[in-house]
Amino acid sequence: MQRIIFCEYEQRDTEGLDFVPYPGELGQKIFACIGKVGWAAWLVHQTMLINENRLSPRNPSHRAFLEEELNKFLFERRVAKPEGYIEPDA
């Protein structure tokens, strides 16, 4: 059964996630307030951040940086691109 939520990222009613995608309170907030399209957009952005900044998800300071960027991206609509980043051709 599909769950419809108001997505804070897309600013419209959309299909909600099927599962809590992140641990803790933040994961519950994402589950309640972010749709599938918004979460997919974050995963693409997160991959770019990891690759361009050479981050390791095993490093606690890198994880903290990614969590901060996740909050900015999904809930504050602020997107930071690494210095010198060039968008790939579509």
Curated annotation (Swiss-Prot):
Transmembrane segments: none
A Pfam family reported for this protein in Swiss-Prot or TrEMBL: Iron_traffic
One biological process term in Gene Ontology: cellular response to oxidative stress
Cellular component aspect of the GO annotation: cytosol
Keywords: Iron
Gene Ontology MF terms in the entry: iron ion binding
Family: Belongs to the Fe(2+)-trafficking protein family.
Function per UniProt: Could be a mediator in iron transactions between iron acquisition and iron-requiring processes, such as synthesis and/or repair of Fe-S clusters in biosynthetic enzymes.
Protein name: Probable Fe(2+)-trafficking protein
Organism field: Xylella fastidiosa (strain 9a5c)
